[in-house]
């Protein structure tokens, strides 16, 4: 069954669910760490493009983590 979401959005939302029990800032860091360690750069670029286009179906935790990764290290 497909929900019509781009794969990187669906995956980011699924990852966020795993860290939703944490305080928001901790969850952002954990999701961002996961993305940094396991995602190919093109996946993150696609997710950031989705956010830039409005990203209506992205979990707030996933969106904050992606924005965190947008910042220079």
Regions found by a protein language model. Name each.
Residues 66-73:
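Short, charged, intrinsically disordered terminal tails
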Residues 15-60:
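Amphipathic, hydrophobic secondary-structure cores in small proteins
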Residues 5, 9-10, 29, 51, ...:
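N-terminal intrinsically disordered, cationic/polar leader segments
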Residues 13, 63-66:
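Residues within alpha-helical segments
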